[in-house]
Amino acid sequence: MRRRNFLLLSGSGLAAAGLAACGGSGGGGGESGGSEVEVFTWWAQGSEKAGLDALVEQFEKDYPDLTFVNGSVAGGAGSAAKDMLQSRLQAGDPPDTFQAHAGLELADYIDAGQLEDVSDLYDEYGLTEAFPSDLVELLTLDDKIYSVPSNIHRSNVVWTNVELLEAAGIDPSAVPSDVDAFIADVQKAADSGVTGLSIGTTWTQVNLLEAILMADLGSEAYNGLWTGETDWNGAEVTTAVGHFEQLIALTNTDRDGLDWTDATQMQIDGTAAYSVMGDWAVASFQQAEWEDGKDFGYFPLTGGEAIFGFLADSFTLPVGAPNPDGAKAWLDTISSQDGQLAFSLAKGSIPARTDVDTEEFPAYQQTAITSYAEDAISPSLAHGAATPVAWLNEISDATSKFTTGASDAAGYQEELATIAEKHASA
């Protein structure tokens, strides 16, 4: 029920909501008590840490009597943090608040009774009016809401090193019309003597897989993969798996030892032409003082349909949190106009609120704002919007087997289909 509700919304409702460019000021009342507030995230490095630092700065302005305690754990798009978090929750030792991806990633925590209902905060902080109505509906389960989004990201973005593309005879302003055309360009870049497509460990490979599936299947059929309405054994999935195999062959051989920051750094260092990564990568290019359009470029991986690969960072209130009032103060800051503006400017995302002044956002975020308002919306697999954690973990294991040579394309597709049959009917 949850899965179908999310995917029905993601096809059109969220896209219609958009973002307005109007002014406003942030929240922040004045919780006092001098208590520590442990905030558990996986934002431990690069632009992610820069985004967290921006939130902490705003939090300290909003609540000077509270002390932020950084519980960040690095690695694997949150996989290391989620493993540690699960151990703590099972041991009855929750942090005051923890980061999660909005969507079905939260289902396991909700089913285990590990999250408090924060619906009252939506009324207290005015969030029901500030967030798009369809986003609020997406976050609602049985008339309860269990997380507060801090921003919205796009997962299906191709990033380019303009100089390397030009050296390979590729027009950096031309957007490939489909995945076959993109593969041809990556091959051309590889033939010029650089890594065609830089990538990291398993979760970044799953991010590439989802981008290919979106492009090859289109939004409706891609969304159907998670509801049982699209056959994982179908010809379109076979095509997508073949494209994935071709692109993996054009990536760096040390990929399994790298994270996304390392893969992006390969482009900045001039050793890789392309990457496929969420739009948090833009902050890395900006921090390197690269100029948009001159040094780096970007476009969504497409098969013809304009699709926004959706994910949202959010924060929760765990059952048994040592300082629930401190956690609520953090939720106030991250959902405020000032908090969402500061965070998204630093992290490369766009605000979840519709009343944040977006005029000062750089060019990439402006394109994301437009796309989010106009394009089809599909939930990210790699980042918890499309499936519960258990399903994603099994896809990740199957993907690792495939990219390390332990299975072939046919076996990989068959395993993906078996995993889907197990979970889609659950």
List PLM regions with ranges:
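Conserved N-terminal structural module of periplasmic/extracytoplasmic solute-binding proteins
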Residues: 2-107, 112, 172, 361, ...
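Short helix-initiation/N-cap motifs at beta->coil->alpha
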Residues: 72-84, 103, 177-183, 255-268
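Short, solvent-exposed loop/beta-turn-alpha elements that line the ligand-binding surface or hinge
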Residues: 119-131, 174-177, 197, 216-239, ...
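Long, aromatic- and glycine/proline-rich binding clefts that accommodate carbohydrate-like moieties
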Residues: 64, 296-299, 344-396, 425-426
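Hinge/lid segment of periplasmic solute-binding proteins
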Residues: 101-155, 363
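Glycine-centered hinge/linker elements that transmit conformational signals in sensory
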Residues: 184-188, 227-256
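Extracytoplasmic/periplasmic solute-binding protein
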Residues: 141-150, 156, 180-229, 272
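Extracytoplasmic/periplasmic substrate-recognition and gating elements
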Residues: 61, 249-250, 287-349, 407
